Amino acid sequence: EEVADGQAHGEXVYREEHHEGEKNXHLVXKDEETKLFVGALSWETTEKYGEIEGINVKPNLNRXRXFAXINIKTPNALDDAIKYGTITXAAVVLDKXKXYEVDIKKATPKDAMMMPPMRGGRGGLGLGGAWVAPGSFGYGGGYGGYGGGYGDDAYGGAGYDYYGSGYGGGYGSGYEGYGYNGGYGGYSGPARGGK
């Protein structure tokens, strides 16, 4: 049975469920093989490495969220996107072209990560955390079944905990999901949650 999870501004994401309400295990496995997490993302980025099935972003915010979870049609296309590293050519307004650095990682559901729960720095909880800011969206709320999701002003959340830290300290002070320290600096707006 197909169920539409509606969000503000007409956003809807579809998921399949068994009649008992359990998620289709085949879809979860495919999702893990074809989902990318892209950080430091500009709205003007248009480079494409493979056919995209869906992009999950929060719409109409009057500011860049700087990250998105992207479903690519085939695992090979996902591998190609990762293989090219973190630099991609982006078409920007006024037809100018420039090199733009983004952070491309394979998305990993939190229950597939073997690390114990920890705080992720400013902006909420890190891996395994459960804090979600008011008005947040994410897997389990709108995107169907991966926990609480991204916090409103933080990467940390209960769903795909890619970075586990918030916007507030720059582009992230944790990177717990990938073993990085430090971050890019960049967006420094307000963060809510842990200190």
UniProtKB/Swiss-Prot annotation:
Indicate yes or no for the key word Ribonucleoprotein.
yes
Q: Which InterPro entries match?
A: Nucleotide-bd_a/b_plait_sf, RBD_domain_sf
What are the RRM domain coordinates in residue numbering? 32-48
Q: Where is it predominantly found?
A: cytoplasm
Question: Which intervals of the chain are annotated as region Disordered?
Answer: 1-23
Using the record's annotations, give every residue carrying the modification Asymmetric dimethylarginine: R119, R122
Q: Which domain of life is it from?
A: Eukaryota
Query: Which key words are in the record?
Result: Cytoplasm, Methylation, Nucleus, Phosphoprotein, Ribonucleoprotein, RNA-binding
Q: Which residues carry this modification: Phosphoserine?
A: S173
SUPFAM superfamilies in the record, alphabetically? RNA-binding domain, RBD
Q: Does the keyword Cytoplasm apply?
A: yes
The record's subcellular locations are: Cytoplasm; Nucleus
Gene Ontology MF annotations = RNA binding
Q: Which GO terms describe its cellular component?
A: cytoplasm; nucleus; ribonucleoprotein complex
The biased composition feature labelled Basic and acidic residues covers: 12-23
Write the signal peptide boundaries.
Answer: none
Q: How is it modified after translation?
A: Extensively phosphorylated on tyrosine residues.
Q: What does this protein do?
A: May regulate mRNA translation and stability. It binds to poly(A) and poly(U) regions of RNA. This binding is inhibited when the protein is phosphorylated.
Q: What is this protein called?
A: Heterogeneous nuclear ribonucleoprotein A/B
